[in-house]
Amino acid sequence: CITSPGVLPDRTVSHRNHANMARMTKLILASSSPRRRLLLRAAGFDFEVESPDVDETVIEGEDPDRMVVRLARNKALAGATTPDAVVLGADTTVVLDGRILGKPEGEAEAAEMLQSIGGRTHVVITGWALAQGARIVEDGFETTLVAMRSVDPVEAAAYAASGEPLDKAGAYALQGDGARFVSSIGGPRSNVVGLPLKPVVEALRRAGIEPGL
């Protein structure tokens, strides 16, 4: 956790500002990702879903960890249209050799991206943010190392043609058929799927949101 400006550490970072925050029980997930919905539901939370339209353009030279937190904050604020609710936004990216790998734009790019991470270890970073009204009350990010086995061109093309990787950062789905390409995971598995549950659940509880409410 950091409480003053500075360089972000390599692992989870969290900013808190709960001094005047009213305890709320209504939760909104500002995400169109079905994986995040499943994770949050599996954690026992009741919530509504909004899919805010947010510009996800990468700023040249921006660090990936700061980028995902920025986008998560923008999503949470865009979804904060109900004053009596806490809104959760999140954004996930894959980083290989310092290069951000977003969602592939088609099958060819998906196959190429999958082959580029095959036989290597990449970093998955997910940023998250909680908003109430027009302000962010807490945010942070989590990193996970993922080692992949080698993927040959035929295998990559077949997987891309299945459609599964087309809306996934890094062009694979850990919770789906893409799991067969993963050889090991160093860090939270849920973070790779799209939401680091431990810090998010803790933050939601601090915001007055409890599982099962």
For each feature predicted by the language model, list its residue ranges.
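Intrinsic-disorder-associated, low-complexity terminal segments enriched in Asp/Asn/His/Tyr and depleted
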Residues: D10, H15-N20
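Anionic-ligand binding patches
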Residues: A22-I28, G61-L213
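N-terminal beta1-alpha1 ligand-phosphate binding loop
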Residues: T25-F45
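Cofactor-binding loop segments of dinucleotide-utilizing enzymes, especially the Rossmann-like FAD-
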Residues: S32, P52, G133
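Residue-level detector of anion-binding/catalytic polar loops
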Residues: D46-E48, E210
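A short beta-strand-loop structural module common to alpha/beta enzyme folds
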Residues: E48-E56
